[in-house]
């Protein structure tokens, strides 16, 4: 068997210890041990909750370039069958954050040995999948002190071949909001439905009616998605359910559409209360800002990537994906791009297995990009 690169090995280590948002204790310790093994002459390392900031001091800094990598996994039971599969039952790096971290460590390693003129700030961010680490990290005292002038991030894209970079100027990812709806009626015996108030029936009606919002209330040219991913109700087959809970997500390409969708959800839920004589409550949970790429920086990046020759550059369409990196881009100019990893299974799938060839190729490309950007006269 051929030897694997050090950063592929790191990815496999990290893949085995996925942790949920703000619980990335093992992950943080693993990263810190590696960072402490690097030359420390130009490094400043500070922790924030389960995240890490690493500043690489430049030789004659005029600006600071930021690079963000997210850290958390998902509550998914892995089904890849890989020898380095998750050791944490019911947890998986099913969104590629293990790949993101290994790439960041590869780039950091190079610049710890070969600093730029400008400063570099590596931001290892917890809780991207929820409840959202970017916004509080952005508001932290450390970020205020070390705030970069520009910031960059990537996300793996299973649908693109290895060697592909995809991005666009302006809006890249959607506004997103979690959605939780609780219904309370009156339970009873299945043989006497007229004496009870069935919340499973109410929940089913609500799911159907929510889909009419996208079909009939949102401008067809202004995309929106309402997905109910989980329904829970009832206790046993012969008891009418007194409670039901719906959990889902809202995604829109504009804040105006998000506001309209929420108004319609509230109106429809109120209608369910009246029609089914029940009580209902709505909680929107975590909300993520749209990812809006700085047009000039993104165009410059795409021009560099095309001239580089080592990657295939695609100008992609905006996606309904949610990413809390949008909060950082709302405050700091920068951009995000897709990195092709050629997997037959998509993000958040229990069998997602990114092609690891993408790791070293991404490291080499980002070293070239940051060297060009951070040494420019």
Curated annotation (Swiss-Prot):
Coiled coil: none
Tree of life domain: Bacteria
Pathway linked to the protein: Amino-acid biosynthesis; L-lysine biosynthesis via DAP pathway; LL-2,6-diaminopimelate from (S)-tetrahydrodipicolinate (acetylase route): step 3/3
Protein's UniProt keywords contain Calcium: no
GO biological process: diaminopimelate biosynthetic process; lysine biosynthetic process via diaminopimelate
GO molecular function, one term: N-acetyldiaminopimelate deacetylase activity
Record's catalysed reaction(s): N-acetyl-(2S,6S)-2,6-diaminopimelate + H2O = (2S,6S)-2,6-diaminopimelate + acetate
Classification via InterPro entries: AcetylDAP_deacetylase, Amidohydrolase, Bact_exopeptidase_dim_dom, Peptidase_M20, Peptidase_M20_dimer
Keyword Amino-acid biosynthesis included in the entry's annotation: yes
Pfam annotation, one family: Peptidase_M20
Active site (UniProt): 70, 129
Keywords: Amino-acid biosynthesis, Diaminopimelate biosynthesis, Hydrolase, Lysine biosynthesis
EC number(s) on file: 3.5.1.47
HAMAP family according to UniProt: DapEL (MF_01692)
Function: Catalyzes the conversion of N-acetyl-diaminopimelate to diaminopimelate and acetate.
Protein family (similarity comment): Belongs to the peptidase M20A family. N-acetyldiaminopimelate deacetylase subfamily.
Name of the protein this chain belongs to: N-acetyldiaminopimelate deacetylase
Organism classification: Bacteria, Bacillati, Bacillota, Bacilli, Bacillales
